[in-house]
Each structure stands twice: as C-alpha cells, then as structure tokens.
Amino acid sequence: MRFMLDTNLCICAMKHRPAELLAQLRAHEAAGLGISSITAAEWHSGMAKSRSARNEAALLQFLEPLELADFDAAAAAAYGRLRTALELAGTPIGPWDTLIAAQALALNVTLVSANLREFARVPGLKLVSWVSAGE
C-alpha cells in the first residue's frame, strides 16, 4: 500500500462521486490503495446505524479492492508517540484521526484525506487531498 484513504475521503467517494476523486482513485489503483482497520471499523459502525442492506452492499463493494491494514504493535507505538507530541504541542486532533495518522506514519504511506486542516498538525505525515475544497 502506498496510499491510505481516510474515512472522510471514502465517504466523499461513495456519496458525492466527484469526477476528480474517482479519476485519482483509478490512476493510483495500481500503486496500492488501502484503508486502516480503524477506518473499516468507523465504516461498519455507520452501516450498522443505517440499517440499510443497500448501503452495506455499496460499502462492501467499495472496500473489496482496497488493502486492509491491521492496527498492529508498530501502529500502537506510533500512536503513543504521536498523541503525546500533539498534546504537548497543544495541537491535538480527534481520537480516530490520531489512530489513523499514527498507522500511516508507522507504515510510511501517504494519507489521502479531505481533512487537511486536522491532519496538517501531524509532524512527518505525508498528506494529500484528491478533492477540491467544498466537496
């Protein structure tokens, strides 16, 4: 995996289907696209709340070609360092975003997100957005 897709980017892809994002996903597919197991957990929680078989089928279809990165010991150690650094700097980010960013750091992959403002606070994180502001 070279690119880890954040939860909000996946939501944007499924709900709004912006042409530029879909083109980027196709263009980078061979390079290796994946998601964190944290993102998968967020998705499955949302699907359980929606109670929609159609939504669940769409989610599973979207996730099928993506590599799923398990949150392992290296990610846990990166999380501990990152959370401490952000708290000491007075610039914490949300708990799920901290977990996802830490895993991206541990895997040395680029995080693809529509939430650049939040993730820009993470030192050393490779970060891009494949959507225009307002998507």
Task: Show where each model-derived region lies.
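Generic structural signal for small/hydrophobic residues in well-ordered secondary structure
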Residues: D6-T7, L21, W43, Y79, ...
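Active-site neighborhoods of divalent-metal-dependent phosphate/nucleic-acid chemistry enzymes
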Residues: A57, E67-A114
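Acidic, PIN/NYN-like endoribonuclease modules and their adjacent C-terminal/linker elements
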Residues: M1, R26, A101, L105-E135
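A short acidic, often aromatic-flanked loop/helix-cap motif at beta-alpha or helix-coil junctions
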Residues: A41, A74-A77, A133-E135
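Short, well-structured N-terminal submotif of metal-dependent ribonuclease cores
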Residues: M1-I35, S45-L63, L88-A89, A133-E135
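Alpha-helix capping/helix-boundary segments
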Residues: L9-C10, T39, A75, I100, ...
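Nucleotide phosphate-binding site architecture
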Residues: C10-I11, A41-H44, A69, A120, ...
